[in-house]
Amino acid sequence: MNVEEEIQKLEEEIHRLGSLQSDGSYKVTFGVLFNDDRCANIFEALVGTLRAAKKRKIVAFPGELLLQGVHDKVEITLRPPPPPPQAVAATS
């Protein structure tokens, strides 16, 4: 699995485990993700996938590195998808 596929899987898992927010984002704590059996089977390096997703501005969390135990209560936010582009009205 390449990085893009792992990020897509990460998004799916955050949707599954997280809570939908009023702005369309999803929130989940690092501990919930890290300790989930399904996530453990999918991601060889969850922290690396999270960092790659953060770099692409798909997720947000404080700091650069999350560690098991120490950061279990840190919230990870899956940002809402961008709105579809507005259709340009044809002028006559």
Swiss-Prot record:
<protein>
    <recommendedName>
        <fullName>Costars family protein ST45-2</fullName>
    </recommendedName>
</protein>
<dbReference type="InterPro" id="IPR044302">
    <property type="entry name" value="Costars"/>
</dbReference>
<dbReference type="InterPro" id="IPR038095">
    <property type="entry name" value="Costars_sf"/>
</dbReference>
<comment type="similarity">
    <text>Belongs to the costars family.</text>
</comment>
<dbReference type="GO" id="GO:0032970">
    <property type="term" value="P:regulation of actin filament-based process"/>
</dbReference>
<keyword id="KW-0007">Acetylation</keyword>
<dbReference type="Pfam" id="PF14705">
    <property type="entry name" value="Costars"/>
</dbReference>
<feature type="modified residue" description="N-acetylmethionine">
    <location>
        <position position="1"/>
    </location>
</feature>
<dbReference type="InterPro" id="IPR027817">
    <property type="entry name" value="Costars_dom"/>
</dbReference>
